[in-house]
Regions:
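A structural boundary/capping signal
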Residues: 1-277
Length: 277
């Protein structure tokens, strides 16, 4: 369909006949996300028609959601190997123009900040201390305790810019840098608190990134689980998958939107959970 024809259909979305509006919107939906640039262009030209602007916004969001679902499903079916890609896909939920290339560039820059200070002969705990020094003392990453439940804490682009996040977003950034440096650092799905573990050759310890990289051990997890009156489970001690991490990020977002009274966003995110189950 030609661009003029699409623009004519967009104008018909403002028709007084609701049957015409329904038919036109249905037809536009069949065209798919490729027409988003045309929709955006028309939106800019309709400042005096907020009702039609709102309809266009809803269509754009539907198309963006469709694209996001497709990317997320492809990511899962491809083995969910690249955690950074999964985090980028989630970020495009609210920041559709955000590119993976931009995310990769920003993450690489973090790596280059740490790499010159790392030494091959360092003990694993000392390696973590070096990483902590750069991430928390030099670069000033830290916990967003003032707005702990804010949705932006789960969007990696916002966390990289503000340097404030929740446990899982900070852990993802920290873990990616650590793994790029060759460290066997992985995520651990503790209840109410996402942490990391360094696990290799019989040596295992844990890292609380939300508390400036505090190092702790299995006994501390035992005590934590006991305080929560939970039965010990292997998942509280061992690495989890990238898929589990992305699921948890989505659930955090759902909770954030529920607390903010944004039920529509929560319902949409629940569709993503269904895709990944």
């Amino acid at each position: 369909m030609t661009e003029p024809a699409i623009k004519a259909m967009i104008q018909l979305m403002d028709d007084s006949d609701q049957e015409v509006v329904h038919m036109v919107e249905t037809q536009i939906r069949t065209l798919g996300p490729s027409i988003i640039p045309i929709l955006e262009s028309e939106w800019e030209n309709l400042s005096l028609n907020p009702v039609l602007q709102n309809k266009i916004e809803n269509l754009i969001h539907e198309f963006q959601m469709e694209s996001m679902k497709t990317r997320l499903m492809h990511w899962k079916q491809s083995g969910a190997m690249d955690l950074l890609e999964g985090m980028w896909i989630l970020a495009t939920y609210r920041f559709p123009e955000y590119s993976f290339a931009t995310l990769k560039k920003d993450m690489d820059q973090l790596y280059y900040e740490v790499w010159p200070q790392m030494r091959d002969n360092l003990h694993p705990i000392d390696q973590i201390k070096v990483l902590n020094g750069v991430m928390f003392d030099q670069l000033k990453f830290g916990a967003n305790t003032k707005n702990f439940h804010a949705a932006n804490n789960s969007f990696i682009n916002v966390v990289l810019e503000s340097k404030k996040g929740n446990p899982i977003s900070l852990c993802v950034i920290y873990m990616w840098v650590a793994q790029k440096l060759g460290m066997p650092v992985y995520g651990v799905n503790l209840p109410n608190l996402f942490v990391l573990t360094h696990k290799q050759n019989g040596l295992q310890f844990y890292i609380n990134v939300f508390n400036k990289g505090l190092i702790f051990n299995k006994i501390d997890i035992d005590n934590y689980i006991a305080q929560l009156n939970l039965t010990p489970n292997e998942i509280y001690y061992n690495p989890c998958s990238n898929l589990e991490i992305i699921r948890r990020v989505i659930r955090n977002l759902m909770m954030a939107y529920e607390k903010a009274g944004e039920q529509d966003y929560k319902d949409e995110l629940n569709e993503l959970i269904d895709l990944l189950d």
